[in-house]
Amino acid sequence: MLTTTFVILGIAVLLGSLLAVLYLRTEGAAAPWPLAALHGLVAIGGLFCLALALRGPLRGVEQGTASFGIIAVTLIGSAALIGVGSLVTHLLKRRLPGILIGVHATLAVGGFAILAAYVLVG
């Protein structure tokens, strides 16, 4: 289950990277909404799967990575909250601040990196 979660969140990271490239190349124009919606749905699905996978047996105790799963779900969950804030900002027809995108991406990539260590080392 944890490997499947890692793959799902990896797809969300790739979609998010594509959205970031599109945002930067079009000088802040709105990203295509179907792609943004797919990114959000895949990410939320991955977050849900990660929360379910963490209910299983403890892993990574010998390597010292036992808490990495909790850290990953916290970082990715925070990124998801900012993503929902981005959606609300878009629906209110306001310009999305660049710092919001940067914080969202930093939390998401950080959570994914911690998850990678948890899956591959733990």
Role assignments for model-derived ranges:
Residues 1-122:
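Membrane-embedded alpha-helical bundles that constitute the cytochrome b-like, heme-associated redox core
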